[in-house]
A protein has these predicted regions:
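Cytosol/matrix-facing amphipathic helices and coiled-coil assembly/linker segments
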Residues: 1-12, 16-18, 72-154
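Helix-coil boundary and interhelical linker segments in multi-pass alpha-helical membrane proteins
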Residues: 36-51, 166-178
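Alpha-helical transmembrane segments and their lipid-water interface positions
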Residues: 29-33, 62-74, 126-130, 134, ...
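Hydrophobic alpha-helical transmembrane segments
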Residues: 20, 48-53, 148-155, 179-184
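Transmembrane alpha-helical segments of integral membrane proteins
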Residues: 164-165, 180, 184-196
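Residue-level signature of catalytic and energy-coupling elements of molecular machines
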Residues: 26, 65, 114-117, 158
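Transmembrane alpha-helical segments and their cytosolic interface motifs
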Residues: 16-35, 141-167
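Residue-level recognition of pore/gate-forming positions within transmembrane alpha-helices
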Residues: 55, 59, 158, 186-190
Length: 196
């Protein structure tokens, strides 16, 4: 009887989506707020565009840097916790074995079922530490490239979002008219972005 291999498809781009949401939402709102405020003060679409693009440049740098630092902090936190787990495995192995047993018992396994698993895991210190990181602390090993990818994704999404409220100011010299279209474009973009 022929068998078809079981293939599971899981969504694995959660971090990238999070970065896009962070960058795009700020990119839509901050330049719009700046353009709306300036429209009340000046009637020159060119001045508003200049200020808007300056804000997009500064905002994308700040947001990208924030994403970079957050991802680096996550990686540093993971590394320090991993070192602590290795230390605990080396210095208090019985306590760590009990913690492993409690984790498996929380899934309904009996003490007799858990004992060989704990024994096998305790012979592999690196796997043991990784297991504790994931199941005791709830930490996943971060991608070493994550900081740069996060920075670029957030900054790019900020720029893309920021262009939307400024686009009407590029299309018309009348700042008041541009503000109306900018508000509509921003609201529609926020609705679509929030819906997706």
């Amino acid at each position: 009887m022929p068998t078809t291999p079981h293939v599971e498809k899981h969504f694995t781009a959660g971090a990238a989506i999070r970065d896009i949401v962070i960058g795009m939402s700020d990119g839509l709102t901050v330049p719009f707020a700046l353009a709306a405020g300036l429209t009340g003060a000046v009637d020159s679409a060119a001045i508003i565009l200049t200020a808007g693009f300056a804000e997009i440049a500064a905002g994308s740098i700040a947001m990208g840097l924030g994403g970079y630092l957050a991802a680096k902090s996550d990686a540093e936190h993971y590394a320090s916790e991993l070192a602590r787990e290795h230390h605990e495995i080396g210095h208090t192995p019985e306590t760590e074995r009990e913690e492993v047993a409690m984790i498996f018992e929380s899934y309904g396994l009996t003490e007799a079922e858990v004992a060989p698993i704990v024994e096998a895991l305790s012979r592999r210190p690196d796997s043991w530490a990784e297991f504790m990181m994931r199941f005791e602390l709830g930490l996943e090993k971060p991608d070493p490239k994550r900081a740069l990818i996060s920075a670029l994704t957030i900054a790019g999404a900020y720029i893309a979002g920021g262009i939307i409220p400024l686009a009407p100011y590029m299309a018309t010299a009348n700042a008041q008219t541009a503000l109306i279209y900018s508000a509509l474009a921003t609201l529609i973009a926020l609705f679509i972005f929030g819906y997706i």
